[in-house]
Amino acid sequence: MIQKHCYECGTALTERELEGEGIVPYCPQCQQYRFPMYNVAVSMVVIDEQTGQILLIRQYGKPHFILVAGYVNRGEQLEHAVSREVKEETGMTVAHLKFNRTSFFEPSNTLMCNFTAFVTDASEFNPNKEIDSYQWFSPDDARKNIKENSLAAAFLNAYLDEENEKV
């Protein structure tokens, strides 16, 4: 999604060359370059450290299993967003986390940042109203049950492939 108007004054943006950046939207009224804006979200491969199982959830009446995910608040660190989203959606506390990778998700204009979130006490699990259903899966079964051809599947498969390379 490319913005057509300045987010400060509403003037129609033009295109202007910026050294080292190429063509960038420019506001002639503010005399400022306006770099594209997008959302930022985190998604998590949630792993129970005691069992090695992976949590997949269903949300909003949809039939497919996905990863826990949520938007990053303005000014919030990604690591905090991971812990906050896992706590808000599942009630569980993240013991430690590991950054995996990012991917831009065009349909929602969102930079998705994927992490592995390790929990030590799955008995804390207390899903909020955003979660319709959930299931803990072995890594192989998680791979089989996550929504096919989704960004969640791409993140999960990349994580599992990297883990398998370590063995």
Model-derived features with residue positions:
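Unchanged
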Residues: V72-H96, R101-F155, E163
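Conserved N-terminal beta-strand and adjoining loop/helix that marks the start
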Residues: T11, G22, P28-I54, Y71
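Short linker/helix segments within small regulatory modules
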Residues: R16-V24
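Conserved Nudix-box catalytic region and its N-terminal flanking loop in Nudix hydrolases
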Residues: I47-E88
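Conserved beta-strand segments that form the floor/walls of ligand-binding pockets within enzyme
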Residues: Y26, I66, N114
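Residues immediately within or flanking Cys/His clusters that coordinate Zn2+
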Residues: Q3-H5, V24
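Generic C-terminal helix-cap and adjacent flexible tail
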Residues: D161-V167
